[in-house]
């Protein structure tokens, strides 16, 4: 049974109903409708922490989706799952792929920055000051771009940039 038919969460049910109405009203191909259904089910599974199921749905959506912009969001969500699982190298791959298709995705830029910042913190713990500085500089570059695209977001990053002299 498709996930859309077994949602227990009110927000997921509402999203599913609205999405189904839009799919019926908007002129889209069967392939696009199927891709969106998989994407929607992936988002639902992801919101419930069912990451394996979410990935299966996202991979199927990727197989069907041809629009680069829409694919960017699928790739971004796959990156989120890998981040949640602590698979930062894989997450970075998906965030970069998302940005290749949609350079105006500040959340992907922010998540890349967060990973580089985390790696910088790890380098400090290992006594690798030079490496940590390079990683923090990389994080700063990505945060600056994210902030340029979404100036009212990422307040903590803005403060960190100012406090570290990287603004």
From Swiss-Prot:
It comes from the Eukaryota. TPR repeats lie at residues 35-68, 72-105, 120-153. GO terms for cellular component: chloroplast thylakoid membrane. Its main location: plastid. It is found in: Plastid, Chloroplast thylakoid membrane. SUPFAM superfamilies: TPR-like (SSF48452). Belongs to the Ycf3 family. This is Photosystem I assembly protein Ycf3. It comes from Stigeoclonium helveticum (Green alga).
């Amino acid at each position: 049974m498709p996930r859309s038919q077994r949602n227990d969460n009110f927000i997921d049910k509402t999203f599913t109903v609205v999405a189904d109405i839009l799919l019926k009203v908007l002129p889209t191909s069967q392939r696009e409708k199927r891709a969106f259904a998989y994407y929607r089910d992936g988002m639902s599974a992801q919101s419930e922490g069912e990451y394996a199921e979410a990935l299966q749905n996202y991979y199927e959506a990727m197989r069907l989706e041809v629009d680069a912009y829409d694919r960017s969001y699928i790739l971004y969500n796959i990156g989120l799952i890998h981040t949640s699982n602590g698979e930062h190298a894989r997450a970075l791959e998906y965030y970069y792929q998302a940005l290749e298709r949609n350079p105006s995705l500040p959340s992907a830029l922010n998540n890349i920055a967060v990973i580089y910042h985390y790696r910088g913190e790890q380098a400090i713990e290992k006594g690798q000051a030079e490496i940590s500085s390079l990683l923090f500089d990389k994080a700063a570059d990505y945060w600056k771009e994210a902030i340029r695209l979404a100036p009212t977001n990422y307040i903590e990053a803005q403060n960190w940039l100012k406090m570290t002299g990287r603004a």
